[in-house]
């Protein structure tokens, strides 16, 4: 897909988020649940509901590699808790989505509310700005499900 087409698709998503109260509420929920985990932070106790259920699975997690797009693959597991790994830019929310880039993070942001969860004052202060000045930062950003 050409950059111009990618920009138009993202702008359409942006308009929908601005006008749709349901999408705005989804963004608020995801941002409120979003967790920034710096390199040296102890993660035990961050999500107690997960820690107390850590032995509930009889089988180890499965990692599946396919030719499907990230959200397309995740949609194949309705009713399941699915994690989508965002190969994210450490310095720009959504990578180059606003300029029409077409890497994995840009594709995720183009067709969901993810960009609007990442592009917040809190994420700029705690994640993007520090990463611009760090040599080799290691942080994790968890964003709860967004449509």
Where does each model-flagged region fall?
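Conserved N-terminal structural segment that caps and organizes enzyme catalytic cores in eukaryotes
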Residues: 1-141
